Amino acid sequence: MDEYRELISVLPLETVEYAFAYGSGAIQQQNEDKSEKMVDFVIVTKNAQEFHRDNILKNPQHYSLLRLMGPKMIEKIQCNFAARVYYNTHVKVGKRKIKYGVISYENVKQDLLDWRWIYISGRLHKPVLEVIKPRQDMCDLVTENRRSALHSSLLLLPESFTLKQLFHKIVGLSYTGDFRMVVGEDKNKINKIVEGNYEELLRVYEPLMNDDARLSVMSPAKLIQDGSTTAIYHRLNLLPSEVLNRIQKNMNRVQKRQRDAEEVIFSLAHRHDVAATVETAIGGIIRPVSLSQTAKNAFSAGVTRSIIYSMAKMSKFLKSK
């Protein structure tokens, strides 16, 4: 952990509320050597403009020519487009390379609770390395986000399934509809994360599973959930608001009717296409965000760094085919 804290010690951390490392450079994946990977960080700040002002003064080389527009404009780019994250990539710190995304506390709160973008919330469905520990309010948001991931995944599974199948669903949620899984990402990524992090996934999700009265863990090879209409209706109502909004919008469009959310959810609980409907709603949130955030990352990184990063991603994708 000290190694990762040292990597971000080059940043101005006065406004930082929470920082974590994620991805294959920080979290072990099956058949991968993380010491050779670039380390990805998310930096949650209570004041994005102040963070960028101090960081441009301290580390101008981390930024593309956008730094010339000043911290106020960078904050606007961060907080008004795509997933509300501003990335600096291919930053050399000692012998490692890092990539860090900056997001405001208010935006991360919105994503964790409502799944507005399923971007940072999606990264936190999976195990991460907490480099700067969060306050209790942030801990509660992360737990609520993971509880939502559990409910969503259970709606995608049959009444009986294995622990590994559940973890595959949880890890796979944030890749639903992500165009990078078609071009640019390792095709075996989900399996590598589950296999390399099984114990950590169990540590994170076991307390949430134990709290779920409608789920019984008989053994790692057999979990049983209540598949009744009442249980499905209960789970649907616990989904984040953005997912529920998408479900309502999609079903009303298909059925050419205008019904409120409660009516739509009650109707869906009695149908046989719950999993497909939930998955479509989640994919509908992620798809445009994955495209717009990738474009934004290329814009913030500058041409040279974007080409280097894209080539590395494409190489990983081709090796996995």
From Swiss-Prot:
Cofactor(s) for this UniProt protein: Mg(2+); Co(2+); Cu(2+)
Enzyme class of the recorded protein, top EC level: transferase
Example of a GO cellular component annotation carried by this entry: mitochondrial inner membrane
Catalytic activity, EC: 2.7.7.41
Listed pathway(s): Phospholipid metabolism; CDP-diacylglycerol biosynthesis; CDP-diacylglycerol from sn-glycerol 3-phosphate: step 3/3
Top-rank taxon: Eukaryota
Gene Ontology biological-process annotations: cardiolipin biosynthetic process; CDP-diacylglycerol biosynthetic process
GO molecular function: phosphatidate cytidylyltransferase activity
Membrane topology according to the record: Peripheral membrane protein
Main location: mitochondrion
Cofactor, how bound (note): Magnesium. Also active with cobalt or copper.
Keywords: Lipid biosynthesis, Lipid metabolism, Magnesium, Membrane, Mitochondrion, Mitochondrion inner membrane, Nucleotidyltransferase, Phospholipid biosynthesis, Phospholipid metabolism, Transferase
UniProt cross-references to InterPro entries, sorted A to Z: Tam41
Catalytic activity of the protein: a 1,2-diacyl-sn-glycero-3-phosphate + CTP + H(+) = a CDP-1,2-diacyl-sn-glycerol + diphosphate
Compartments, record wording: Mitochondrion inner membrane
Function field: Catalyzes the formation of CDP-diacylglycerol (CDP-DAG) from phosphatidic acid (PA) in the mitochondrial inner membrane. Required for the biosynthesis of the dimeric phospholipid cardiolipin, which stabilizes supercomplexes of the mitochondrial respiratory chain in the mitochondrial inner membrane.
Family: Belongs to the TAM41 family.
Protein name (Swiss-Prot/TrEMBL): Phosphatidate cytidylyltransferase, mitochondrial
Species annotation: Caenorhabditis elegans
